[in-house]
Amino acid sequence: MRGQPSIKHLDDVPAEEMLRYEFADGHTASIWEKWIELSPRYVAFWNKWDPGAVSPRHGHVGDHSNLILAGELRCGDIVARAGTHIMLEWGDVFGPWEAGPHGCELYGFIAGEGQPFSGDTAAYEALLKSRGARSVPLPMPKHLPPWMLAKLGGDFTSSVTQWSSST
């Protein structure tokens, strides 16, 4: 317990590049994240998806809530536009998601440590192939707290992220 509220403005929170995709035509699309609050008990975050950015089928350790603030995300026939709420309980997976033509912004909250885990990768790989895209490795985010760095170790590469301390 802090004994008082934690109040932060989004402009005061640094953005981290979570995922980047390179497309056959040479353009890139990324997913950017701001960790508003990050603790072993919960994660509050904001995402900005560039148009066409994708996220693999995955879940997180903890119940997970997303609210689409602007733009849209698509998963097959599902279109989650601004105002859409997505709720996943611990163990649920979702995706692959693809940002719409204007990208997407969302607010998310995970009640738990938030570590991602992979779902079935076949649909994600098929989506990347159909878009002429590939995921590229990124440096480990700079603003991870010590408890998370200790848990992840030097590199954290999965079908969800490709972070490396040597990139």
Q: Which residues are covered by each model-predicted region?
A:
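Residues that flank catalytic or metal-binding motifs in active/ligand-binding sites
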Residues: W32, H64, H102
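Glycine- and acidic-residue-biased ligand/ion/polar-headgroup-sensing regions
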Residues: P51, H60-C75, A82
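Short, well-ordered beta-strand segments in beta-rich or mixed alpha/beta enzyme
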Residues: F45-W49, I68-G71, L106-F109
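Ligand-binding loop in jelly-roll beta-barrel domains
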Residues: V79-R81, W90-D120
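Short intrinsically disordered coil segments
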Residues: H64, T121-K129
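A short, N-terminal "cap"/entry segment at the start of jelly-roll beta-barrel domains
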Residues: M1-R41, Y124, A133-T167
